Amino acid sequence: MSIYEEFGARSIYNLAGTSTRVGGPVLSEEVANAMVEASQHSVDMTELQASASDYISKITGSEAAYVTAGASAGLTMAAAAILAGLDPSKMEELPTVKSQKNQFIISREHRSGYDHAFRLAGAETIDVGMNEILSGAGVRRTEPWEYEAAINERTAGIIYVATENSEPSIESIVEIAKKHELPVVVDAAAQLPPRDNLRYFIEKGVDLVAYSGGKAIKGPQSSGILCGKKKYISSVALQSLDMDEFFEIWNPPSNLIDKSKITAIPRHGIGRGFKVAKEEIAGLLVALRVFIEKDIESEMKQAKKLLEIINKDIQSLNSDKISTLIKSPSNKEQYPTLNIHSENINLFELSNQLKTNDGLFLNETGLNQKFLTVHPMNLSNENINKISSVLKASIKEFIKNGN
């Protein structure tokens, strides 16, 4: 009996990838052991975050960094740092911004439900541009001049959501931001791998970039990384850490917080609810070390071999109602995936039955395009045969019943 079953929940198989709703990646033994070890000892949390800042900064090339409660919390704290700076009175006001300089410019095609992270800190998002290719109205997408045209006395910063095909280029946005002395915040939550992206955005001159620690890095699911300019990371720390201290004898590590630049300790800030435990910080740092040191290309080749087992089993059904395709990205650091396609059966119902009856959670992103996806992140030599066998049997039974 698993720990989940002991308390009334099922253990499932996450074939959806990094999705938070199904728990994200399974932790490696190395990461899990690090978290257990950390749980057995106390630590000054400011010192731990300062040490984490040093380690992460060496990897990312940033001035400083902070371990956050996921990428979304990182975005909230990025906005909070820009809005409040190192001013304790402004930190106390958030999410109210009395100066009204709280607008962040974002492309309409970068908008998503995750924008709430910025608004949570008191930011107002200002949409610009459009994607006429997507709407079928033309050949143009959001262009740099549209960002610049939206800048006014209330503009606090620019938001850039990074994907493989984000437009405009990050270089063009940084150029405009620097011209107007505005910070750029990059949402790169899911932009790993490739590992080069750990340094890419900082090298391009952005001020803050947020990554998920619980996706490809395979750290604790509720962890994240925010890295960038020290003045902003210092503000994040001041608004996140337990500030129940006497200023006279408070000696924060200078690489994280320069005491000489603040006049008083703020009260508990907007980030206090985004507390990150010592165990999560330790797990994230070990996971990051493993991520940058491992032979990721060999891992992707192994992932493809595991998908080929599932692919072979499904194809052995010899059914004309279903087809499969393994998709291999051009970047050798990215996961291959297996698409299960059908024009003839109800894939919505199939996916629902796989979840309900078998505890198999596939990626449903392509359901409206008539395919389900198997992501191999949580496949292993130990579970592949059982998963493949159950998936094959369930699809066979589903087709047999005429669904």
Locate predicted features.
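Short glycine-centered, acidic/aromatic-flanked micro-motifs in structured strand/loop junctions
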Residues: 39, 160-162, 342, 376
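Conserved C-terminal alpha-helix-loop-beta "cap" of PLP-dependent enzymes
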Residues: 3, 311-390
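Alpha-helical metal-binding/catalytic segments enriched in His/Glu/Asp
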Residues: 35, 225-226, 374
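Alpha-helix C-capping/helix-to-loop hinge sites
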Residues: 38-41, 291-294, 357
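A glycine-/small-polar-enriched, mobile loop at the entrance of the PLP active site in fold-type I
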Residues: 15-53
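Conserved PLP-enzyme active-site core in the AAT-like
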Residues: 1-26, 53-67, 71-280, 284-292, ...
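Flexible, glycine/charged-enriched surface loops at secondary-structure junctions
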Residues: 45-50, 64-65, 250, 294-303, ...
